[in-house]
Amino acid sequence: VPALGALAERIGDHILVTHSAGGFPGWMSAMQNSEVKGVASYEPGGFVFPEGEVPDRIDGLTGGVAGTAVPMEQFKRLTEIPIILYFGDYIPETPSKNLGDENWRVRLQMARKFVEAINRHGGNATLVELPKIGIYGNTHFLMQDLNNAELANLLDKWLNRQRFLTKQK
């Protein structure tokens, strides 16, 4: 996270894009660096919650996932920036014997709780489950799947809705 902070200071205002295990350091960086003006995260693997509001651990065959407590003062920073999370296909709603599926099942469940927590505290977080909007076939490496241009267009539309791609006066 210190390296992300140094990079943030060097490049200035930016939108942070994270993937998988990079999601957790992304949340930490966004909480610590005012230069982070938004976060787009592809299937993040870890999540932060305000102290006293960490949901119960979600167990699964791969060990499950637990939220990480942070002071409310830090968490509130996530409520001040737009955040979007994308999750791909092949993620079951019920426990699976396929370890990869199971790993992302519990993380998607925790992502839902994370987005709900941010929005409950006045934030602007969105969770996009691609199959629910008619986009199928994505693996965990969404950005390199055959429909990566379609996913890039989704991100572009979000950036425009957040006014990141328009000149600010």
Question: Language-model features: where?
Answer:
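Conserved acidic catalytic loop of the alpha/beta-hydrolase fold
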Residues: 1-15
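Conserved alpha/beta-hydrolase fold motif
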Residues: 16-17, 39
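Gly/Ala-rich beta-loop-alpha elbow adjacent to hydrolase catalytic centers
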Residues: 17-26
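Active-site signature of alpha/beta-hydrolase-fold catalytic machinery across serine-
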Residues: 28-32
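A conserved short beta-strand
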Residues: 33-53
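The feature captures the conserved acid-bearing segment of alpha/beta-hydrolase catalytic domains
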Residues: 46-121, 126-128
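Short glycine-rich catalytic loops that host catalytic nucleophiles or stabilize transition states
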Residues: 128-137
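Catalytic active-site module of serine/aspartate enzymes centered on a nucleophile-bearing elbow/loop
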Residues: 137, 141-169
